[in-house]
Swiss-Prot record:
HAMAP family: Ribosomal_uS11. InterPro entries: Ribosomal_uS11 (IPR001971), Ribosomal_uS11_bac-type (IPR019981), Ribosomal_uS11_CS (IPR018102), Ribosomal_uS11_sf (IPR036967). This is Small ribosomal subunit protein uS11c. It is found in: Plastid, Chloroplast. The gene is rps11. GO terms for biological process: translation.
C-alpha cells in the first residue's frame, strides 16, 4: 500500500504551497465589472490566474452605496494596491457592464501609476438575441 504524502504544516500554521503574494508580476490584466448594484475589480496575470480582487461590498459599502462611483474608486484602489507592491508596472484594462463605477474605477487605476497598454470595453451586447424583460412600472 502506498504511503500517504506527509503534509508539513496545517491550517493553524499557515497555508502550504506557493502564496499568491510570493510571485513577481510585471504585467497583468485588470478586469472591472460594473453593474448598477456593485463594482468588482479583479487583477489577473497574463495567463488569467487571479492575483488580487476587491469589490465595493468587500470594502464595507452596503446597500445602494455599493453602486456609487466612490465605492468603485475605493474597490479599484484596494485591488491595485496589492499588485503594485508585487511589482506590477504594466496592465491591460477590460471594462464590463453599464454601472456608474466604470469611469471612477478607471480613474483610480490611472492614478495608481500603472502604465496602461490599452483599455477595452468588453460589455456583452446581444445581436438581437433573447427578449429583454418587460419594463418596470413604478
Amino acid at each position: 500500500m502506498a504511503k500517504p504524502i506527509q503534509r508539513i504544516g496545517s491550517r493553524r500554521n499557515g497555508p502550504i504551497g506557493s502564496r499568491k503574494n510570493g510571485r513577481r508580476i510585471p504585467k497583468g490584466v485588470i478586469h472591472v465589472q460594473a453593474s448598477f448594484n456593485n463594482t468588482i475589480v479583479t487583477v489577473t496575470d497574463v495567463r488569467g490566474r487571479v492575483v488580487s480582487w476587491s469589490s465595493a461590498g468587500a470594502c464595507g459599502f452596503r446597500g445602494t452605496r455599493r453602486g456609487t462611483p466612490f465605492a468603485a474608486q475605493t474597490a479599484a484602489g484596494n485591488a491595485i494596491r496589492t499588485v503594485v507592491d508585487q511589482g506590477m508596472q504594466r496592465a491591460e484594462v477590460m471594462i464590463k457592464g453599464p454601472g456608474l463605477g466604470r469611469d471612477a474605477a478607471l480613474r483610480a487605476i490611472r492614478r495608481s501609476g500603472i502604465l496602461l497598454s490599452f483599455v477595452r470595453d468588453v460589455t456583452p451586447m446581444p445581436h438581437n438575441g433573447c427578449r429583454p424583460p418587460k419594463k418596470r412600472r413604478v
